[in-house]
């Protein structure tokens, strides 16, 4: 068969890109140089960033950098192998011990990222003949892990405990095992799961619960712990990686069965050392940990928005084009607030996702609020 130019790989990609462009959904990588104190440089502009998950500003903390530098000099730039071969460095082992203690669990397991953690956890615990119930606004990696498990996967409406109960009543009797997946703080809306009610349902229906704490660690009160507590090292802890905290038997099982741990290189020792030092700071500086939520609530009060439940505040715009235009207008005024568009959020709910950090000051927060009141009065109302 002779090649068909219209069916080439480049033609296929070009057609798909044209469709994304027409819908204002094409993504582009923008080089961004992050600095301390919420500073960022992009496109030759010096900006104040409100689009970073470094909630405590620890990525630039001299103590965290010093810990990473020391580990880099001692252990090298990379782990060099899978953790089950020779890639299980001393900083990794120390970090797992501290994470488990912080979460009140027997053990912890560190993965290469939060996404990799969730790709590995569900398939190691459930499979065909089992049931997964997942909040419809759960992160993409929760859905990816559920799909890889081959368990029956059913979505429940966001934070809808009544529907979750109904689905458990409908499906639990025919499933060997059941796993509920949710988030402590939802990454795009900044709201929180009703964990006491969810955990009570899990107990009633003999189900396990995994809580993704990627955006909650260290910046919101944890409340009741789930049997499976996973999260990332890349947000509050300012480093890179993911983890699961659970009982020792569960961690032992995942060490053998989580494919996203077994078949990939271990986390660089410097990343583990940085996260360990950051966890020290989280535990010993509670006033710093409280600051992002306080700033978020200052912002929502200023704009008359519902009180923030976390350091994440969505400013809903609607159309993707309008969200992009508002982001561009804010950048011209010195603020970096990236537009979030489908498929990350549902169609018609494009938004600015404003993320607050201990590195921000009140003046920066107030200035952003005033700019939004002027540029997007239909999306906010001055309080």
Curated annotation (Swiss-Prot):
<keyword id="KW-0093">Biotin biosynthesis</keyword>
<protein>
    <recommendedName>
        <fullName>8-amino-7-oxononanoate synthase</fullName>
        <ecNumber>2.3.1.47</ecNumber>
    </recommendedName>
</protein>
<feature type="binding site">
    <location>
        <position position="34"/>
    </location>
    <ligand>
        <name>substrate</name>
    </ligand>
</feature>
<feature type="binding site">
    <location>
        <position position="344"/>
    </location>
    <ligand>
        <name>substrate</name>
    </ligand>
</feature>
<dbReference type="GO" id="GO:0008710">
    <property type="term" value="F:8-amino-7-oxononanoate synthase activity"/>
</dbReference>
<feature type="binding site">
    <location>
        <position position="187"/>
    </location>
    <ligand>
        <name>pyridoxal 5'-phosphate</name>
    </ligand>
</feature>
<dbReference type="InterPro" id="IPR004839">
    <property type="entry name" value="Aminotransferase_I/II_large"/>
</dbReference>
<dbReference type="InterPro" id="IPR015421">
    <property type="entry name" value="PyrdxlP-dep_Trfase_major"/>
</dbReference>
<dbReference type="GO" id="GO:0009102">
    <property type="term" value="P:biotin biosynthetic process"/>
</dbReference>
<dbReference type="InterPro" id="IPR050087">
    <property type="entry name" value="AON_synthase_class-II"/>
</dbReference>
<keyword id="KW-0663">Pyridoxal phosphate</keyword>
<dbReference type="InterPro" id="IPR015424">
    <property type="entry name" value="PyrdxlP-dep_Trfase"/>
</dbReference>
<feature type="modified residue" description="N6-(pyridoxal phosphate)lysine">
    <location>
        <position position="235"/>
    </location>
</feature>
<comment type="function">
    <text>Catalyzes the decarboxylative condensation of pimeloyl-[acyl-carrier protein] and L-alanine to produce 8-amino-7-oxononanoate (AON), [acyl-carrier protein], and carbon dioxide.</text>
</comment>
<keyword id="KW-0012">Acyltransferase</keyword>
<comment type="pathway">
    <text>Cofactor biosynthesis; biotin biosynthesis.</text>
</comment>
<dbReference type="InterPro" id="IPR015422">
    <property type="entry name" value="PyrdxlP-dep_Trfase_small"/>
</dbReference>
<comment type="similarity">
    <text>Belongs to the class-II pyridoxal-phosphate-dependent aminotransferase family. BioF subfamily.</text>
</comment>
<feature type="binding site">
    <location>
        <begin position="232"/>
        <end position="235"/>
    </location>
    <ligand>
        <name>pyridoxal 5'-phosphate</name>
    </ligand>
</feature>
<comment type="subunit">
    <text>Homodimer.</text>
</comment>
<keyword id="KW-0808">Transferase</keyword>
<feature type="binding site">
    <location>
        <position position="27"/>
    </location>
    <ligand>
        <name>substrate</name>
    </ligand>
</feature>
<dbReference type="GO" id="GO:0030170">
    <property type="term" value="F:pyridoxal phosphate binding"/>
</dbReference>
<feature type="binding site">
    <location>
        <position position="139"/>
    </location>
    <ligand>
        <name>substrate</name>
    </ligand>
</feature>
<feature type="binding site">
    <location>
        <begin position="212"/>
        <end position="215"/>
    </location>
    <ligand>
        <name>pyridoxal 5'-phosphate</name>
    </ligand>
</feature>
<feature type="binding site">
    <location>
        <begin position="114"/>
        <end position="115"/>
    </location>
    <ligand>
        <name>pyridoxal 5'-phosphate</name>
    </ligand>
</feature>
<dbReference type="Pfam" id="PF00155">
    <property type="entry name" value="Aminotran_1_2"/>
</dbReference>
């Amino acid at each position: 068969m002779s090649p068909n130019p219209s069916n080439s790989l480049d033609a296929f990609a070009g057609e798909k890109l044209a469709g994304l462009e027409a819908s204002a959904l094409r993504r582009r990588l923008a080089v961004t140089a992050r600095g301390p104190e919420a500073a960022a440089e992009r496109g030759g502009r010096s900006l104040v960033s409100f689009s970073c998950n470094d909630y405590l500003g620890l990525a630039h903390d001299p103590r965290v950098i010093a810990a990473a530098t020391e580990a880099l000099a001692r252990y090298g730039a990379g782990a060099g192998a899978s953790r089950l071969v020779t890639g299980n460095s001393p900083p990794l082992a120390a970090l797992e011990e501290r994470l488990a203690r912080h979460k009140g669990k027997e053990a912890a397991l560190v993965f290469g990222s939060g996404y990799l953690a969730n790709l590995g956890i569900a398939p190691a615990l459930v499979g065909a003949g089992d049931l997964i119930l997942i909040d419809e606004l759960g992160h993409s990696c929760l859905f990816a892990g559920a799909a890889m498990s081959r368990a029956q996967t059913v979505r429940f409406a966001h934070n809808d405990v009544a529907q979750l109960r109904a689905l458990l009543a409908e499906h639990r009797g025919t499933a060997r095992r059941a796993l509920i997946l949710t988030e402590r703080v939802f990454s795009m809306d900044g709201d929180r799961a009703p964990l006491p009610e969810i955990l009570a349902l899990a107990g009633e229906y003999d189900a396990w619960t995994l809580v993704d704490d990627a955006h909650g660690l260290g910046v919101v009160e944890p409340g009741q712990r789930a049997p499976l507590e996973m999260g990332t090292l890349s947000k509050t802890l300012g480093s890179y990686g993911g983890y699961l905290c659970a009982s020792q038997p569960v961690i032992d099982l995942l060490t053998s069965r989580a494919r996203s741990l077994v078949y990939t290189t271990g986390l660089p020792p410097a990343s583990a050392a940085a996260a360990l030092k950051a966890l020290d700071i989280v535990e010993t500086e509670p006033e710093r940990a409280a600051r992002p939520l306080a700033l978020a609530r200052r912002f929502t009060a200023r704009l008359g928005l519902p009180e923030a439940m976390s350091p994440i505040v969505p400013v809903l715009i609607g159309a993707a084009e309008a969200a992009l235009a508002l982001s561009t207008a804010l950048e011209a005024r010195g603020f970096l607030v990236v537009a979030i568009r489908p498929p990350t959020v549902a169609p018609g709910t494009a938004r600015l996702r404003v993320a607050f950090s201990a590195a921000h000051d009140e003046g920066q927060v107030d200035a952003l609020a005033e700019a939004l009141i002027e540029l997007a009065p239909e999306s906010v109302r001055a309080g």
